[in-house]
């Protein structure tokens, strides 16, 4: 019976060292956690750069459209060079 008790004790010791039998989940090793943090940081930077790139493109497009609209408004206010050659007095009355 001593042999079976020693075998049972050895098996229990092996199970407790091998398998986590407590309620807490096993903690992953630090190496994969560091790699995961680096990958997450790189992906965050890529997303930030993409947002800035797209935002900058939209800003440039908006500025271009604003400049085009301003040019068109100025052109519509100014009389065309060929049409207003002799009718200068009608605007001041």
Swiss-Prot record:
One annotated Gene Ontology cellular component of this protein: membrane
Membrane-traversing stretches: 38-58
UniProt biased composition (Basic and acidic residues): 71-80
Compartments it resides in: Membrane
Keyword annotations: Membrane, Transmembrane, Transmembrane helix
Main location: membrane
Region (Disordered): 71-93
Membrane topology note: Single-pass membrane protein
Keyword Zinc: no
Name under which the protein is recorded: Small integral membrane protein 41
Gene name in the database record: SMIM41
